[in-house]
Amino acid sequence: MQHTLTPEEVGAKIVEWYSCIISASYEQAILLKEEARHAVMHMQTNDKILAYYSLVEFRHNIFVDEFNKKHELGDTFEFVETEVDRYLKYLYYFISGQYEYTQERYRSAIKMFRKAERLLEHVNDDAEESEFYLYIGLVYYRLNQYLLASSYLEQAETIFNRLSYYERALNCKQVLGAIRSELHEFETGDAILKEAFRESTFPRTSALILRTLGLSKLRQKEYEAAKTYFYQALEYEEHRSHQIGMKTRYDLSNTLFKLGQDDEALELFQQAKAEANQYNNKEYKARCLYLDGLYIAKDHALVDQAINDLYELSLLYEVCELAEEMVELADQRNDDSTSLKYYRIAYKAKVNQNKLGADQV
């Protein structure tokens, strides 16, 4: 049975093909055209990637024709950039950034998106522009650059609303609410999220908002409320049967462990752990390792490995969150040395997450 490819996987293949056209690698371009064509045939439906494929195919045909003419005359072929190429170059960086984002390589993604941003003037479509603002906002959010993330997401939300793309606008609002919660502005964050939920008529987005409200309540240590929101999110098939459902099962398991409901928590944990491995989700594989060390194996070496794995993924907010929880648990036991150890980890993560390094611009 043929595996269905994601748009991001196919986009990455088309990017590789276009790179060969730019570098005038004739034989490699011919080969990759066939690989890209085969990939498109087995892709989940995505109009943007199909349009990108068509544009690159158009540019490929011009390239091949010009290359052959030059070859016949014994001349050297030189790639001459056109207006189409400037738009294709934008798509090259944008789709590369999307792919890096799906692979959880957020610093690489932001490099691609910043290059795409310099070519936005060649994009004459409001919908495409708003999609760019959404994605770059999401990556800055994952890198804990909340001011930049909010700025881009607010721009995207405004354009989406103007275009009547209401679900996309609500996606922006949901992340803006999450940002306020992560900044411990809980009243404002929860109000934004509840307003978004009232406005939503889209099952997938409604479930995502409920999950975000659950995470906010978890931060506030309102565990019963968090539990309710997570269960409500999992009532939606669109949420339950996808990768995001795995994340919610993990968070629900974490909440239930905190409530002392260990049997139910363990069952959900085992399911979430298996799914995290199935999806190869690096963040949640690390998070599952953390829960295992904290509640099941009761082994701080696993906790330390989990925190280190998150640090290597540049998920500094998550490092800070878990380290601060370890500080709190150590303080409850009057274990000053352990408390100091995790306080230092949390402090280092907090300092670093507020820095915008050279590799992020």
Regions found by a protein language model. Give the residues of each.
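Structured C-terminal portions of repeat-based eukaryotic scaffold domains
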Residues: L252, F257-L322
